[in-house]
Amino acid sequence: AHMWSDMFFRLAAEGDYYGHDVQLPAEVMKNLPSNISLAYWDYYHTEESHYDAMISLHKKFNRDIWFAGGAWTWSGFAPQTRFTYATMQPALKSVRKNKIENVLITLWGDNGGECPPFTVLNALYAIRRYADGEYDHGVIAAEFQKLSGLRLKTLIYWHCPISLPHHTRPTRSLILARRCYIPILFYVYMTERRSSGKPR
């Protein structure tokens, strides 16, 4: 069995999970059952060195480590594909370098689970190839198209309704989505209903 590790780190660091200078209590590490592995979850950071530091802290527990990454489906009705790439490529580089064998990728359903899982199929394939040590998106795109018949570049555009140009972090883009794109999509929806003769 594995436990998500933030509970131990937050106890030692007054609520902070991602601090690199946390002093983990020896008693906590010692009393963790030997059959429990730790899941280090992180979907936010874009620096490989950050993942290296966090994995190093987890190794102090002397337990098996899982890395839990994420393909961003939980910030609205469209995926955050660019931010998934920006976080998961350095994460998987660190995972390979630090010889972490167990990896899981989350697709959380926050905000009503509005984002269809299919829209991150390309991101999941890219993450899988990062785990293999392949980081060239040209190669990954060609493989993905051969395997699925779908163009990686086309699926990347799914993130556009809630993204700003050259903006990888998902926070502020949600404001744009709610103020601009959602009313536009509603207008398109109502226009299609009227043209099909369906009642409003």
What is each model feature region?
Residues 1-200:
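Substrate-binding groove of N-acetylhexosamine-processing glycoside hydrolases
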